[in-house]
């Protein structure tokens, strides 16, 4: 009864409160939903709120705050009074027949008033059909056993060409790096040998010619060295097997026990002395030695107190 009276009042006051106001235009595709909020005065908190659809014969109520706000079966419009002067209306699963003009109304102390008007336009599902067609074409392309290629996507051969070129470029860079490293290592080794040869040449030229003996023979360590590398070999001292040493009296003048004969000792290996000082060679004649005047030549150090050995 109350709703009937409200509709009658709306028929009489159709233009009151909405003169000069235009409805809000909303557009939504088929199957979507809209959410509309309406503001009312705080004095109308306990008043009845209605969401209705404007028709030529009047405003048809769709949902009201006075009834159960739970969603019944088949209902696609919901009204919620949030309090504080805010009313919220939601329409879900829109269809083409839902297009039209809607409004929020409140039955307050001043009578029925329209709070907000909405003009809803439902878009046809053309875009959705095109999207569905594109999706079905993609599914058919993937499900085709013949492997029909999509013209929008490049083939597998076209995709593999950049990968092949990238691999070739990477291999070329690696080969160039290895060759450059080998050339630098060889050049560095050649420079090192040249510096060593110049150092040895300068050292040989600075030494006393009388103290240096160059041996170039077919045997010994000098034969194993290359001809382009300068080398030095000093004469080794005479062996203890010489008859000059074996004929010397080895009795100690102080009565100490004499040392064993040198011939009983193992021969010492030749010593190679590299020294920058000149070496003095002298002939020493031991008294009481070999009557035949046998002498032995060998390297001798400088005598102490600057005394020159007799010859």
Curated annotation (Swiss-Prot):
Principal place of residence: membrane
Region annotated Disordered, chain positions: 229-263, 287-311
GO BP of this protein: calcium-mediated signaling; innate immune response; platelet activation; signal transduction
Tissue: Detected in platelets, monocytic leukemia and in T-cell leukemia.
Signal sequence, start to end: 1-15
Disulfide-bonded cysteines: 38-104, 52-59
Spans within the Extracellular topological domain: 16-162
Membrane-spanning ranges: 163-183
InterPro entries: Ig-like_dom_sf, Ig-like_fold, Immune_rcpt_domain
CDD domains in alphabetical order: IgV_pIgR_like
Positions occupied by motif ITIM: 279-284
Domain of life assignment: Eukaryota
Description of post-translational modifications: Phosphorylated on tyrosine residues.
UniProt membrane topology term: Single-pass type I membrane protein
Lipidation (S-palmitoyl cysteine): 196
Regions of this protein lying in the Cytoplasmic compartment: 184-311
Record note on quaternary structure: When phosphorylated, interacts with PTPN6. When phosphorylated, interacts with PTPN11.
Functional note: Cell surface receptor that may play a role in the innate and adaptive immune response.
Name of the protein in its database record: Trem-like transcript 1 protein
